[in-house]
Amino acid sequence: MAGPELLLDSNIRLWVVLPIVIITFFVGMIRHYVSILLQSDKKLTQEQVSDSQVLIRSRVLRENGKYIPKQSFLTRKYYFNNPEDGFFKKTKRKVVPPSPMTDPTMLTDMMKGNVTNVLPMILIGGWINMTFSGFVTTKVPFPLTLRFKPMLQQGIELLTLDASWVSSASWYFLNVFGLRSIYSLILGQDNAADQSRMMQEQMTGAAMAMPADTNKAFKTEWEALELTDHQWALDDVEEELMAKDLHFEGMFKKELQTSIF
């Protein structure tokens, strides 16, 4: 038999639930713009820019090579894929994996990430836990087992309380992870306000992702270009153009009116 249902004071909604939602939302907005101010542009070397342009040229050749004559296509393909001295065959780049302990730029980016992500969560979470501690804020609309009590009822030590009720501290963390769609709607998909995404990147190491291996990119592009054959798309363009009724007769029958001043 279920126990009596709890009735929450309406002031809890006004002075606890809504303030936590508003504070969490604006902290995320501030974090987004602070991250924009603190982010540093990654400097590219001349070699990296040149390699990226070569890959773009090869991809354009694969996609639009059908609009140039076959000899021109084969000449460009020979430049890239010649087995002896083709660009993708002879060019070998030295890939040096960066070390965060020796690269001051990576250390600076890590510190900026901690300042904009970890520090606000600790400060705001501690302040909310101290200010709004002990409140039962809301209830999830489905029953839960007792295993969810430590996650949803932080700061409330009531063994007889149903696990579906949410404490104020847990309500803050639910907002941290639940406002992702709101941030994407207002700030766009790639925003710095999504604290849960930033936490996942730091835990998985995506924030310090290794740069792409240029040699592997060259090999992949070489294989793709090697499988590309020339299919002349303008083979019968003259016949198709002459077969179309372009209605030129009306253009030469119009009299041009001139005025003499």
UniProtKB/Swiss-Prot annotation:
InterPro entries attached to this UniProt entry: EMC3 (IPR008568), EMC3/TMCO1 (IPR002809)
GO cellular component, one term: EMC complex
Effect the entry attributes to changing residue 31 to K: No effect on EMC assembly and no effect on membrane insertion of hydrophobic transmembrane helices-containing proteins by the EMC
Protein topology in the membrane: Multi-pass membrane protein
Transmembrane segments: 15-38, 115-130, 169-187
Effect of residue 31 to A/E: No effect on EMC assembly but decreased membrane insertion of hydrophobic transmembrane helices-containing proteins by the EMC
Organism of this sequence: Homo sapiens
Swiss-Prot/TrEMBL keywords: Endoplasmic reticulum, Membrane, Transmembrane, Transmembrane helix
Family matches, as Pfam families: EMC3_TMCO1 (PF01956)
Assembly and interaction partners: Component of the ER membrane protein complex (EMC).
Residues in compartment: Cytoplasmic: 39-114, 188-261
Lumenal face of the membrane: 2-14, 131-168
Record family assignment: Belongs to the EMC3 family.
Free-text function comment from the UniProt entry: Part of the endoplasmic reticulum membrane protein complex (EMC) that enables the energy-independent insertion into endoplasmic reticulum membranes of newly synthesized membrane proteins. Preferentially accommodates proteins with transmembrane domains that are weakly hydrophobic or contain destabilizing features such as charged and aromatic residues. Involved in the cotranslational insertion of multi-pass membrane proteins in which stop-transfer membrane-anchor sequences become ER membrane spanning helices.
Compartments reported by the entry: Endoplasmic reticulum membrane
Cleavable signal peptide: none
GO biological process: protein insertion into ER membrane by stop-transfer membrane-anchor sequence; tail-anchored membrane protein insertion into ER membrane
Protein name: ER membrane protein complex subunit 3
Major localization class: endoplasmic reticulum
